[in-house]
């Protein structure tokens, strides 16, 4: 007689009468990763490991901090604040600039070309702009370079207390308009360019480029430095030519294009009046933003209220020690927001212009790691050495514990 099969038993002897092929389809695969059987390692923080880690961190941070500090001190620079030039400097006669307006970092000292003995004066003359002349005020600054500066020589302008990171200011532009598209008036009016969207004179023309950022562009102009006297040379009145080409990041030009607007559709921003007194004309057309690197640098908004922006540079020729003169057309009013402005002539290191703070921060962190390292060495190996895993330190082995005993 054949054995009786249990009720509900399958052909494979399973209790539910189903084969492996009938298993639920949402069952995770039987792998170490999916079934959480991966091998694991847990770091045990032994005294030797802690001391080793802090020693390595201290060496890295102190070494890197010392290197950054050294690089910062190899940079040579001269910074002159010319905010008060038009109001304080005499007209047509040079006067010494107050020393608190000058900051210099040079390794050489030369009484003949002392960087803190800069001079300034103001002058006024007519300037030809397109098809008309305009009366402009200039600040002329004479400054000294006590040692030869090797290229690249960079010329920055510096603004203080100007908040480009304000929420409304940051968004005040139209990206499509900057790319060259002829964006219609309604779109501009509804965009974040408000309130700089249309001609304030009521003509209905579109402001190009619209927005607060473009309207507030830094519009002081600087000439290339003119060498008046060079050490060990009889040459005089020799220009040290600088260029505004190559001062912006290469990728920025992809964000801009030549405008598709016709001249009768657009007007310049209100603060551009000195450059476009009679608006955009055939002989004074709107700028080609794709090639205007000064504009591109200005549109790269600064995160802090005090910032530098590159204006011009010289990549090829050294700037010899001597006396130089620079002419500044001062148009950008910083007094309305209690700010300051200056220009900076500087060399560059591997890490860029002079900035001592990264090196200081690394040295501070490295110093903290070193102090902790010394503390752990003294604590674990000199003051109170103890054996790891000693059962006598367990709470129930302490004499004060109930039923405890000393081992």
From Swiss-Prot:
Q: Which InterPro entries match?
A: CDC50/LEM3_fam (IPR005045)
Location within or outside the cell: Cell membrane
Q: Which organism is it from?
A: Chaetomium thermophilum (strain DSM 1495 / CBS 144.50 / IMI 039719) (Thermochaetoides thermophila)
Region of interest (Disordered), ranges: 1-33
Q: Which UniProt keywords apply?
A: Cell membrane, Disulfide bond, Glycoprotein, Membrane, Transmembrane, Transmembrane helix
Q: What is this protein called?
A: Phospholipid-transporting ATPase accessory subunit CDC50
Disulphide bridges, residue numbers: 85-139, 193-210
- Gene Ontology cellular component annotations, sorted alphabetically: endoplasmic reticulum; Golgi apparatus; plasma membrane
Similarity section: Belongs to the CDC50/LEM3 family.
Q: How does the protein's chain sit in the membrane according to the entry? A: Multi-pass membrane protein
Q: Say where the protein is mainly found.
A: membrane
- What's the subunit arrangement here? Component of a flippase complex consisting of DNF1 and CDC50. Interacts with DNF1; the interaction is direct.
Where in the sequence does UniProt note compositional bias of the Basic and acidic residues kind? 15-25
Q: What does this protein do?
A: Accessory component of a P4-ATPase flippase complex which catalyzes the hydrolysis of ATP coupled to the transport of phosphatidylcholine and phosphatidylserine from the lumen to the cytosolic leaflet of membranes and ensures the maintenance of asymmetric distribution of phospholipids.
Instruction: Tell me one Pfam family matched here.
Output: CDC50
Q: Which domain of life does the UniProt lineage start with?
A: Eukaryota
- Extracellular-side stretches of the chain, per the record, are 70-359
Residues carrying sugar: 131, 189, 219, 232, 241, 314
Positions of transmembrane segments? 49-69, 360-380
Q: Can you tell me which residues the record assigns to a coiled coil? A: none
**Cytoplasmic topological domain residue ranges:** 1-48, 381-407
């Amino acid at each position: 007689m054949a054995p009786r099969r249990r009720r509900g038993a399958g052909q494979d002897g399973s209790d539910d009468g189903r084969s492996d092929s009938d298993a639920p389809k949402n069952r995770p695969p039987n792998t170490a990763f999916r079934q959480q059987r991966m091998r694991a390692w847990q770091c045990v923080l032994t005294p030797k490991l802690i001391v080793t880690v802090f020693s390595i961190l201290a060496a890295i941070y102190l070494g890197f901090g010392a290197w950054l500090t050294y690089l910062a001190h190899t940079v040579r620079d001269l910074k002159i604040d010319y905010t008060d030039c038009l109001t304080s400097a005499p007209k047509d006669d040079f006067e010494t600039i107050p020393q608190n307006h000058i900051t210099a970092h040079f390794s050489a000292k030369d009484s003949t070309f002392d960087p803190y003995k800069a001079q300034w004066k103001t002058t006024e003359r007519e300037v030809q702009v397109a098809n008309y002349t305009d009366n402009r005020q200039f600040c002329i600054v004479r400054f000294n370079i006590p040692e030869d500066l090797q290229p690249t020589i960079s010329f920055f302008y510096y603004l203080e207390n100007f908040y480009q990171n304000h929420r409304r200011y940051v968004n005040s532009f139209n990206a499509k308009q900057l790319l060259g598209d002829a964006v219609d008036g309604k779109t501009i009016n509804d965009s974040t360019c408000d309130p700089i969207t249309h001609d304030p004179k009521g003509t209905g023309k579109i402001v190009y480029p619209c927005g607060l950022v473009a309207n507030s562009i830094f519009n002081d102009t600087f000439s290339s430095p003119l060498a008046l006297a060079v050490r060990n040379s009889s040459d005089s009145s020799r220009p040290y030519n600088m260029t505004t080409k190559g001062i912006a990041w290469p990728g920025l030009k992809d964000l801009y294009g030549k405008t598709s607007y016709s001249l009768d559709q657009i007007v310049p921003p209100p603060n551009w009046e000195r450059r476009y007194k009679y608006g955009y004309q055939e002989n004074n057309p709107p700028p080609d933003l794709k090639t205007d690197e000064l504009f591109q640098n200005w549109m790269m908004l600064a995160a802090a209220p005090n910032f530098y922006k590159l204006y011009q540079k010289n990549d090829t020729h050294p700037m010899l020690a001597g006396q130089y003169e620079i002419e500044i057309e001062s148009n950008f009013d910083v007094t309305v927001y209690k700010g300051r402005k200056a220009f900076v002539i500087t060399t560059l290191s591997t890490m860029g212009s002079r900035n001592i703070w990264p090196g200081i921060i690394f040295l501070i962190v490295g110093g903290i790691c070193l102090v902790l390292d010394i503390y752990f060495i003294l604590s674990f190996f000199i003051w109170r050495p103890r054996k790891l895993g000693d059962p006598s330190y367990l709470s129930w082995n302490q004499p004060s514990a109930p039923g405890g005993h000393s081992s």
